[in-house]
UniProtKB/Swiss-Prot annotation:
It is a multi-pass membrane protein. It comes from Escherichia coli (strain K12). This is Methyl-accepting chemotaxis protein I. One of its GO terms (cellular component) is methyl accepting chemotaxis protein complex. The gene is tsr. Residues 1-6, 211-551 are cytoplasmic.
């Protein structure tokens, strides 16, 4: 039955039983403590009542004694034989004692009453107290008034005896209550001890039952599981694991049995995998050796290619430098042609200015020729007029003739100058035309030189681009050479790793040989696992070889 109950449920039941025992014992102890508290309260109340009532009784007795002494002193003073304290001092002392009695009585009445105390007895003692107290107060008044006869005639002793009787009865009643409370305390203590013993017996019985249940449902299955775990740790995977019960221990045993089965399968797979790894590592080592040889050949080819690229880079750089110098020379020629074109433009402008000035001079000469013609006409008119004047106008005619001659010579000179100016203007026009033609030619030269300069610049730029491209190709080839060298090193490391893997596979095979599993399962797994990986590895090596040959 215990094997079918879950451990958690068992623990909850144990906790519930212990909790119930704790609650039961706690309730019983609480009841005992409650009774003890009530009895202690009764004892405390009785003690306080007795203390305050006794204080009031003593104060009343002291008041009466003081009043008796005061009365005697009063009588002695009347006979002139007194000495010691005066009547006034004794009466004051009696008043103080009476007030103390009143205070103690007030404290007594303020205390709570136990239900078991007699109400009639309390009322009777209060009545006798009031009588005795009032009698003492009356004695103080009588003695103060000098009524000594009434003072001694008062039956104070009877009042005192009555109060004392009730006081003794009340004290006897409190003593009985005190004895009852003590007896109840003793009974509560005995009951608590019996409860403690009973609870201890029940707890011991529950502990024994719990231990028996734990041993049957937890310890024994745990020992069996520990023994199975030790066999598994020793490499024995064949010994069966017993599953008994459906509680947590049964589930743990079932899980351990499942783990044993999985471990058997895993160990078989590890053995087969180790064999496959050993075979694959051998193939990898062979392929790596072949790959290492081809990598070395490829590295040598890349070194030759890198050397050729360096020579080609040097040649292209030299061509780029020559193209750059030719571009600079063409640029210089273009600048010179541009300056020549500017000079020709200036000459053309100057020739145009000269042509304009010559035209202006021709215009001025035309004006001079007109003036000479008009002067000649005027001289002719003057000669005609002088001829008409006869002898008187002869001198004027001579002058007019000279003026006419001068006008004719001026006209002749003007015509010659005009002819020369016109010839000069014609030549200047021809020169201007030639200079303009030369300017256009210089512009064409400048344009051609500019195009040549642009072409040379493009050639130089292309040469620079080619140089940079060849540099990049050289860097790429160098990087390929470096990567090839690294690949060669990695191939060597891979070969070493394959050898190490082969050794580790051998060690792994030796390590898993410690475990004992079913022979049939091991052989079946070995056949399946060792045959399948061979073809992919071969094809991987072939692909690698084809890639290297193509590269």
């Amino acid at each position: 039955m215990l094997k079918r109950i879950k451990i958690v449920t068992s623990l909850l039941l144990v906790l519930a039983v212990f909790g119930l025992l704790q609650l039961t014992s706690g309730g019983l102890f609480f009841n005992a403590l409650k009774n003890d508290k009530e009895n202690f309260t009764v004892l405390q109340t009785i003690r306080q009542q007795q203390s305050t009532l006794n204080g009031s009784w003593v104060a009343l007795l002291q008041t009466r004694n003081t009043l008796n002494r005061a009365g005697i002193r009063y009588m002695m003073d009347q006979n002139n034989i007194g000495s010691g304290s005066t009547v006034a001092e004794l009466m004051e002392s009696a008043s103080i004692s009476l007030k103390q009695a009143e205070k103690n009585w007030a404290d007594y009445e303020a205390l709570p009453r136990d239900p078991r105390q007699s109400t009639a007895a309390a009322a009777e003692i209060k009545r006798n107290y009031d009588i005795y107290h009032n009698a003492l107060a009356e004695l103080i008044q009588l003695l103060g008034a000098g009524k000594i006869n009434e003072f001694f005639d008062q039956p104070t002793q009877g009042y005192q005896d009555g109060f004392e009787k009730q006081y003794v009865a009340y004290m006897e009643q409190n003593d009985r209550l005190h004895d009852i409370a003590v007896s109840d305390n003793n009974a509560s203590y005995s009951q608590a001890m019996w409860i403690l013993v009973g609870v201890m017996i029940v707890v011991l019985a529950v502990i024994f039952a719990v231990w028996f249940g734990i041993k049957a449902s937890l310890v024994a299955p745990m020992n069996r599981l520990i023994d199975s775990i030790r066999h598994i740790a020793g490499g024995d995977l064949v010994k069966p694991i017993e599953v008994d019960g459906s509680n947590e221990m049964g589930q743990l045993a079932e899980s351990l049995r499942h783990m044993q089965g999985e471990l058997m399968r895993t160990v078989g797979d590890v053995r087969n995998g180790a064999n496959a790894i050993y075979s694959g590592a051998s193939e990898i080592a062979t392929g790596n050796n072949d790959l290492s040889s081809r990598t070395e050949q490829q590295a040598a080819s890349l070194e030759e290619t890198a050397a050729s690229m360096e020579q080609l880079t040097a040649t292209v750089k030299q061509n780029a430098e020559n193209a750059r110098q030719a571009s600079h020379l063409a640029l210089s020629a273009s600048e010179t042609a541009q300056r020549g074109g500017k000079v020709v433009d200036n000459v053309v402008q100057t020739m145009r200015d000269i042509s304009t000035s010559s035209q202006k001079i021709a215009d001025i000469i035309s004006v001079i020729d007109g003036i000479a013609f008009q002067t000649n006409i005027l001289a002719l008119n003057a000669a005609v007029e002088a001829a008409r004047a006869g002898e008187q106008g002869r001198g004027f005619a001579v002058v007019a003739g000279e003026v006419r001659n001068l006008a004719q010579r001026s006209a002749q000179a003007a015509r010659e100058i005009k002819s020369l100016i016109e010839d000069s203007v014609g030549k200047v026009d021809v020169g201007s035309t030639l200079v303009e033609s030369a300017g256009e030619t210089m512009a064409e030269i400048v344009s051609a030189v500019t195009r040549v300069t642009d072409i040379m610049g493009e050639i130089a730029s292309a040469s620079d681009e080619q140089s940079r491209g060849i540099d990049q190709v050289g860097l790429a080839v160098a990087e390929m050479d470096r990567v090839t060298q690294q690949n060669a090193a990695l191939v060597e490391e891979s070969a070493a790793a394959a050898a190490a893997l082969e050794e580790q596979a051998s060690r792994l095979t030796e390590a898993v040989a410690v475990f004992r599993i079913q022979q049939q399962q091991r052989e079946t797994s070995a056949v399946v696992k060792t045959v399948t990986p061979a073809a992919p590895r071969k094809m991987a090596v072939a692909d690698s070889e084809e890639n290297w040959e193509t590269f």
